[in-house]
Amino acid sequence: MTEKRERPGPLRWLRHLLDQLLVRILSLSLFRSRCDPPPLQRFPATELPPAVAAKYVPIPRVKGLPVVGTLVDLIAAGGATHLHKYIDARHKQYGPIFRERLGGTQDAVFVSSANLMRGVFQHEGQYPQHPLPDAWTLYNQQHACQRGLFFMEGAEWLHNRRILNRLLLNGNLNWMDVHIESCTRRMVDQWKRRTAEAAAIPLAESGEIRSYELPLLEQQLYRWSIEVLCCIMFGTSVLTCPKIQSSLDYFTQIVHKVFEHSSRLMTFPPRLAQILRLPIWRDFEANVDEVLREGAAIIDHCIRVQEDQRRPHDEALYHRLQAADVPGDMIKRIFVDLVIAAGDTTAFSSQWALFALSKEPRLQQRLAKERATNDSRLMHGLIKESLRLYPVAPFIGRYLPQDAQLGGHFIEKDTMVLLSLYTAGRDPSHFEQPERVLPERWCIGETEQVHKSHGSLPFAIGQRSCIGRRVALKQLHSLLGRCAAQFEMSCLNEMPVDSVLRMVTVPDRTLRLALRPRTE
C-alpha cells in the first residue's frame, strides 16, 4: 500500500492564501451587513487602565494584520489542520501564556503551564461556558434545535449535569462495565478469529506466521464506540434485534459523516457557507438532520424491543434517567449528543493508544504478564501516556465569567482562554523525556518522571469536565488489555505517522496495524 504525504507547491499555497483572505474579507463584510454576531463570540477590551496594568505582568501579544489578523501565519504553518503545531510554536516563542487574535476575529489567551491551566478551572464559575463549533451553533440557531448536555448553558445545564454525574461518574458503575466488556469482547474475538485464520497459512518463502492487518480500523472503532453507548443506554439485549443492528450500522456511517463535514467547516466560515448555500454547508445541514432523526428513531425502536421481550431488562442508563424524572425528549437529546461526541473522541483515542502500543513490543509483553496477575498499574500508565501525547481535544476552552488574576496576569471578563493540551503534554518542565511512552512514570514512587501531573488534562477538570470520561477510560482499558493478552501487534506504516486537527486530533494517514497470535 503506497503512502503519500501531500506537499503543496508554492503556487498552490499562494492560491490557497488568496482564497482564504478573500473569504475572510467577504465574510466580515457579510457579517456586518446581514447577520447578527454569534452570541458567544466576544471581543474583550485588551487595553487596561494604567493603574490596573501597573499591578500585573503584561501578557505577550502576537501582532497581526488588520482584518485578517494572524491568518497569514496560520496558513503558512499548514492551516487549521496544524493549529496545534502552530500554537505549540507560539508557546516556544512567547512562553506559557500569550494572546492572539486568530484570523482577525476571535481574541484568545493561550496557556500551557500546568499551574495556569488549573487556575483557569478555578475561575470558570458556577455555569462554565466553553467555545462551541461555529457550524453546530449556527445549525442550532437556524433550526431552533434543542441539543444535549454539550450545548446547554446555565441552570438547565447544571440540573442535567448533576443527574448524569450520579449515573455516569459516581457510585458503583459495575452495571456499566458489563456492557463495555461485552461489546469489546465481541469485537476482539472477531479479530482473534481472523488472526488465527491468517496464521494458519504460513508465508511460503520463510514459513513465518502470517499477520492479519486490521481492515477499516477507524470504522470498526466507530461502530464499537457507538455500540457500547447503545448498550449502556438500553442494555445488551437490544443487540439481539437484527433491525437494531442494521440501524446501528447505518447510524455509524452518518455520524462519521457529521465528523467529516464539521471538519471541512473548520477552514471555511460556516455563516458565509450558509448564506451562499454552498455544498459544504448543505451537506453538513442534511447530515445533521439525518443523524438527529435516526438517533431518535433508534431510541424509539430500542424501547419497543424491550417492551416486546417481556423479560427483566438489563441494568441500563435509560431506566435510570426515567427514574430520575428526566423527560423522554431530554433523554433523546442526551443520547444523540453522547453518541456524536463519543463516536470520534473514543474511536480516535483508541486508535492512538493502539498505535502507541504497536510501537512497543516489550511493553506488550509486560502488559500481557500484568493482565495474567490481575494487576493494572502499567495499563493505567499506558492510557495516561497515550492521552498525554495524543489528546483528541488539543485545546480546551473557557470563557471567564469575571475579571481574573492568573499567574500574575490580568484576564478580562468574557475572555476566551484556551488550554494548549498538546503543548502541555509534551513540555519537559511537566514530564521527563516527554516524547517517550513511559507508562511507569505514573506509578507510585516514580514521581521523578512526572514534575506536574496536571500538565495532562485530557478530560479537563472542574464542573464541566468530560461527562463520558469513566466510560472512555473503561473502554480503553478493556480494549488494550484484551489486545495485549491475545496479540502481538505491529505497525505497518512505512512513513512516519503525525497528528492533524480535524475537529479532534487524528492520524495524518490511515493507520495500518497488524496482529499475530501471542505465543508467550
Curated annotation (Swiss-Prot):
GO biological process, one term: ecdysone biosynthetic process
InterPro entries per UniProt: CYP11_CYP27_families (IPR050479), Cyt_P450 (IPR001128), Cyt_P450_E_grp-I (IPR002401), Cyt_P450_sf (IPR036396)
UniProt pathway annotation: Steroid biosynthesis; ecdysteroid biosynthesis
Domain of life: Eukaryota
EC nos: 1.14.15.-
Cofactor(s) this protein cannot do without: heme
Keyword Transit peptide: yes
Broad enzyme group: oxidoreductase
Residue numbers binding heme: 466
Family stated for the protein in its record: Belongs to the cytochrome P450 family.
Job description of the protein: Required for CNS development: midline glial cells. Involved in the metabolism of insect hormones: responsible for ecdysteroid C2-hydroxylase activity. May be involved in the breakdown of synthetic insecticides.
UniProt-recorded name of the protein: Cytochrome P450 315a1, mitochondrial
Organism whose genome encodes this protein: Drosophila melanogaster
